[in-house]
A protein has these predicted regions:
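Conserved HGGG/HGGXW glycine-rich cap/lid loop of the alpha/beta-hydrolase fold
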Residues: 2-53
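Structural signature of beta-strand start/N-cap positions in the alpha/beta core
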Residues: 13, 40, 79-81, 105
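Active-site loop/oxyanion-hole signature of alpha/beta-hydrolase fold enzymes
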Residues: 42-81
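Short beta-strand immediately N-terminal to the catalytic nucleophile in serine-hydrolase-like folds
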Residues: 82-84, 109
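Gly/Ala-rich beta-loop-alpha elbow adjacent to hydrolase catalytic centers
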Residues: 84-92
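Flexible "cap/lid" loop of the alpha/beta hydrolase fold
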Residues: 93-97, 103-135
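Conserved alpha/beta-hydrolase catalytic His-Asp/Glu region
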Residues: 116-123, 133-161
């Protein structure tokens, strides 16, 4: 996991957590300059999501623990707010439930599509519909790549399947 930092380190901390398969820059590049004027902005790039690290996303709990440990070490265990988009919202919920850090505000964002341009959202929506339809209808993804990834995970973590 990598955390990117913006703004004054002594300012109130806002933690930004991106959505599934989203790069932190694509989710937050437009708001970071605005937030960094008055806040210390931390953007999390999960294991397996960052081009600067050779890592693999394992579990939500493992990643949540890493985020909490970072907040304890770098922020004294206290942040003003955490905003999570999609998958990031799940992390915000887990951190609130676990109570290992103090978070003044937790904001759960919606779908990643709500941050995209109309054209990009339309294209992503159509791609997702085609994948999800075949999964629901046939019980398999139409993409051989996705099927191979799922099969690899089944072998690696049979307790989840």
């Amino acid at each position: 996991m990598k955390v990117y930092s913006f703004g004054a380190e002594n300012a109130p901390v806002i933690l930004l957590l991106p959505g599934t398969c989203c790069h932190w820059k694509s989710n937050f590049c437009h708001v970071i300059p605005l937030l960094a004027k008055n806040h210390h902005v931390l953007c999390v790039s999960y294991d397996g999501f960052d081009e600067n690290e050779d890592s693999e996303f394992t579990t939500m709990n493992d990643e949540t623990e890493k985020i909490e440990n970072y907040i304890k070490e770098k922020c004294g265990g206290h942040i003003l707010a955490a905003y999570g988009c999609s998958l990031g919202g799940s992390f915000v919920g887990l951190m609130a439930a676990r109570r290992n850090i103090h978070m003044g505000y937790g904001i759960l964002g919606g779908s990643d599509l709500d941050q995209a341009s109309p054209l990009a959202a339309d294209i992503m929506g159509k791609m997702m519909i085609s994948m999800i339809y075949t999964l629901v209808h046939d019980g398999k993804f139409s993409s051989r790549f996705l099927e191979k990834r799922i099969e690899k995970q089944r072998r690696r973590m049979p307790e989840y399947y």
